[in-house]
Amino acid sequence: MNILTQIKINKLKEIKKLKKTVSLDVLKKRVLTSVRDVRPFEAALEKKGVMNLIAEINPKSPTAGKLIKTPLDQIANLYQRSNADAISVLTDQRFFGGDVKNLNRVKLIAKQPILRKDFILDEYQVYESYLKGADAILLIVSLLNGKKLM
């Protein structure tokens, strides 16, 4: 079994467990009643005549192991000062050492829009991403069927 298949199987188990803790309906209601700072991701990447930069926080890789030793807060501060246009935060825990809680941690430090980089397979994760502070999410089309994309 390839790594992408392993990740997908694990992620589906995680989502099932999350749904038992907080239902999708409850999550949707929380989104509707929440008030939060949403930063314009697309607008941040529309500079003309220069390269746009999305800086990434990726703690580890399933093939390379641990990638960073610097604390998350220090990395977020560095990206804030570097004038990156947006910050991508890997949130998959098992394979990439991330945590969905890191979205809000980075958002409290940096002014840039925050992209949640994970294996988004279910609408549940979209609502969760919003509530945890993401301004955008990354979708891997090869993991989703046409119905899921609509």
Regions inferred by a protein language model and the residue ranges of each:
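Conserved N-terminal beta1-alpha1 strand-loop-helix module at the mouth
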Residues: 1-114, 121
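Conserved anion-binding
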Residues: 109-150
